[in-house]
């Protein structure tokens, strides 16, 4: 809760931390899906460094660049929706997908799948396309009821919020509403729950991909506790990454008096 307090105390520092975590989130969420383009290259792509025309290297590398920037734009959009406390809906989920893939995959961006799919590396078989809208609508109603009943943030409510984030995250992974990009949408929707409640992004690092996938395998629509437990671990690691930054800001404030961070 200390970083939650410091974020409120130093809004400019919080904004900078959110930018850093957004970039980190975009990179690692993409690498979890495909390790062929390593995160060191995704960092180059995200910051538009290196050669200007990425297609000169390969079409796949250029596609990775487009999708990475699309995801970063989608996360920015989610932050604005979170500030308005917009309820989760199918239209929100479709807009998330559309913003991410509108340039790299225009014919499929924001479109719910119309055929059955299998998930690579997972034993779970997603529901038939005819059941997607009904499942999402029912589950989103339950998630919204729990999420927007949260009145304040406390150590006790934090774990409730984490469970809601896990429920939203697992739901999208379970239903697999799109032909592609479901993992990225699932992780982003879980983060949306955290953002609505004033928390930071929960960045799942690729180093823990196997642990993450195992936690998903152990979940069901009635019990997302295994994922919630994993998210607790990954969120603590995320906070550890930004703690030193806030300590620098706090130390300067104590030494020099309130500065621009106020």
Residue ranges: model-predicted function:
Residues 1-180, 184-262:
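FIC/Doc superfamily catalytic core
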């Amino acid at each position: 809760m200390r970083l939650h307090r410091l974020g409120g105390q130093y809004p400019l520092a919080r904004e900078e931390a959110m930018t850093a975590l957004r970039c980190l989130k975009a990179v690692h969420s993409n690498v979890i899906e495909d390790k062929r383009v390593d995160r060191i290259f995704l960092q180059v792509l995200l910051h538009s460094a290196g050669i200007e025309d990425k297609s000169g290297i390969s079409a796949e590398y250029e596609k990775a660049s487009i999708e990475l920037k699309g995801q970063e734009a989608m996360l920015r959009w989610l932050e604005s929706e979170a500030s308005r406390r917009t309820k989760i809906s199918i239209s929100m989920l479709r807009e998330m997908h559309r913003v991410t893939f509108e340039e790299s995959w225009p014919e499929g961006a924001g479109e719910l799948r119309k055929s059955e799919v299998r998930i690579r590396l997972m034993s779970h078989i997603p529901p038939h396309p005819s059941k997607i809208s009904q499942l999402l609508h029912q589950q989103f109603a339950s998630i919204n009821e729990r999420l927007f009943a949260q009145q304040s943030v406390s150590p006790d409510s934090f774990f409730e919020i984490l469970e809601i984030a896990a429920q939203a995250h697992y739901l999208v992974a379970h239903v697999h509403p799109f032909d592609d990009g479901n993992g990225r949408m699932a992780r982003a929707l879980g983060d949306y729950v955290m953002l609505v409640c004033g928390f930071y992004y929960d960045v799942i690092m690729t180093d823990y991909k196997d642990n993450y996938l195992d936690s998903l395998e152990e979940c069901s629509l009635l019990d997302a506790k295994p994922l919630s437990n994993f998210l607790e671990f990954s969120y603590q690691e995320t906070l550890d990454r930004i703690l030193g930054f806030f300590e620098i800001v706090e130390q300067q404030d104590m030494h020099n008096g309130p500065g621009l961070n106020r």
